[in-house]
């Protein structure tokens, strides 16, 4: 009988396997894909943003905002980087706190983990779709589509539904439910937003630094600031990812409001437009924002205000006010998100009040543990979700 079976060979599952083996336990890691760590290769645009120096409970979300605290403290960013250094991974950090492999290749992170999994005491079996986990006399009986195994303990590290094209599945929730556990409602998070495509489609590929406000009527649902990328279907970029959770859970009737002059007061924008009217008077109104933003974006904002072919000199102060409003409160009706297929993480998961935050052991089924995305913990964009994977995998792997 194996000491522990780990279901899921993603980031948290691999860390759990390595941690359990370090204490001398025999480990069987079951992964449904043809290789472990497939989702890692897609993180950080292929660079793998493996952690963030600002990782702390206030960067995470879920019904219990403090549930992640012990795991993050027990295996913090410093311990994580020291651990990966021991595996041979060199890293670099950015001013934002994001940490990447020095190679700028996600494959480097996966490779050092895969080599580490070759240590004695760990058996990795890929292509194993787990169909059932049942308590048995001395532990658990675990069945897959092709085999049956027995273990004294089980760690559920099956991930969430996000990124289904690179391995996201709902298996973990199904297996936990059969054992009496419950989950919250699931939403896609860290995902692109779909909006009325009229203007974004014309601006496809353009990036802009913006203040971002999501509203329902006069109510503010979410706020952020950062880089926004216009796409054929709406908007994307790190700043959009961080508000996407609020959009996913916020229901209908939402509007994304963009401020292309986030450091200016409206009156300052208006004063500047008056000056531009003087200097660009002989030119078309659509040139007024030239020099302040991408040419196509400036033209679009003037068009949205209702001005295209008019001479700049012919614009009234009221006309300039309309342009200033578009430049500081440009509105895009939100029609949804790009869903779980494109999402980087699942918001929601197994209810954390059914697990001990000091050990990640189930309060309902002794000997069952859970870690990573399958739990109701999701972080902001920027390496926070991988830090949760490492921290929770390390804690669960101790089998306390």
Role assignments for model-derived ranges:
Residues 126, 298-378:
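A glycine-rich dinucleotide-binding beta-alpha-beta segment and adjacent secondary-structure elements
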Residues 34-36, 41-42, 50-57, 90, ...:
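An anion/pyrophosphate-binding glycine-rich loop and adjacent beta-alpha core
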Residues 153-199:
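Glycine-rich loop(s) and the adjacent beta-strand/alpha-helix scaffold that form part
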């Amino acid at each position: 009988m194996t000491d522990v079976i780990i279901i899921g060979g993603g980031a948290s599952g691999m860390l759990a396997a390595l941690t359990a083996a370090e204490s001398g336990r025999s480990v069987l890691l079951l992964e449904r894909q043809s290789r472990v760590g497939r989702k890692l290769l897609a993180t950080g645009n292929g660079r793998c943003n493996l952690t963030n120096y600002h990782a702390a409970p206030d960067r995470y979300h879920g019904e219990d905002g403090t549930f992640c605290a012990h795991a993050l403290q027990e295996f913090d960013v410093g311990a994580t980087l020291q651990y990966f250094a021991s595996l041979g991974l060199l890293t670099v950090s950015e001013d934002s706190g994001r940490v990447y492999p020095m190679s700028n290749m996600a494959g480097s992170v996966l490779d050092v983990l895969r080599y580490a999994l070759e240590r004695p005491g760990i058996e990795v079996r890929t292509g194993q779709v787990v169909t059932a986990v049942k308590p048995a006399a001395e532990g658990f009986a675990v069945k897959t589509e092709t085999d049956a195994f027995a273990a004294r303990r089980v760690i559920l590290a099956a991930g969430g539904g996000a990124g289904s094209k690179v391995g996201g599945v709902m298996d973990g929730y199904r297996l936990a439910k059969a054992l009496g556990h419950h989950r919250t409602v699931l939403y896609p998070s860290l995902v692109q937003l779909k909006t009325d495509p009229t203007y974004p489609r014309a601006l496809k590929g353009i990036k802009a630094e913006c203040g971002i406000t999501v509203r329902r009527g006069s109510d503010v649902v979410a706020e952020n600031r950062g880089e926004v990328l216009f796409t054929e279907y709406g908007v994307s970029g790190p700043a959009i990812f961080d508000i996407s959770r609020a959009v996913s859970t916020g229901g209908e009737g939402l509007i994304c409001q963009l401020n292309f002059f986030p450091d200016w007061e409206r009156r300052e924008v208006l004063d500047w437009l008056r000056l531009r009217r003087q200097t660009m008077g002989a030119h078309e109104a659509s040139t007024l924002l030239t020099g302040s933003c991408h040419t196509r974006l400036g033209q679009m904002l003037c068009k949205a205000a209702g001005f295209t072919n008019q001479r700049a000199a012919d614009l009234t102060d009221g006309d300039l006010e309309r342009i200033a409003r578009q430049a500081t409160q440009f509105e895009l009706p939100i029609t949804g998100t790009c869903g779980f297929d494109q999402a980087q993480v699942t918001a929601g998961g197994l209810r954390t009040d059914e697990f001990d935050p000091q050990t990640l052991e189930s309060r309902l089924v002794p000997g069952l543990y859970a870690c990573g995305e399958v739990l109701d913990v999701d972080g902001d964009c920027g390496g926070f979700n991988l830090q949760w994977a490492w921290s929770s995998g390390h804690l669960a792997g101790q089998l306390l």
